[in-house]
Amino acid sequence: MDIKQKADSLARKYKTRNPFEILQGLNAILVFAPLIDTRAFYQYFQRNNIIYIDENLPRHEQAFECAHEMGHMFLHKKANTIFMDTRTELNTCRYEREADLFAMSLLVSDDMIAE
């Protein structure tokens, strides 16, 4: 299943494109907190999916960040991109592009674009 299909599948299953509602249905943990030098990040810890979002962002930006981090949750669960970004010279651009595509596909359907 490609990235767009995965996002569309989630939207159909949960009958919404609201990432906060989908995340709740997935029993993932969502944490709003003041973050420094980052807008949001995903963590897989002790078999829990946790998404942290900067509480100071406007709600529409929080929604995009939530969808973006969900992309990491579904596409890159085993990749420790925070570690790769801060402790190695590995390029994580591909992961970020894929998470952006997932977020855009989740938030905006083909029908919405056609209108």
What are the functions of these language-model segments?
Residues 1-115:
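Active-site hotspot residues in diverse enzymes, especially metal/ion-binding acidic/histidine motifs
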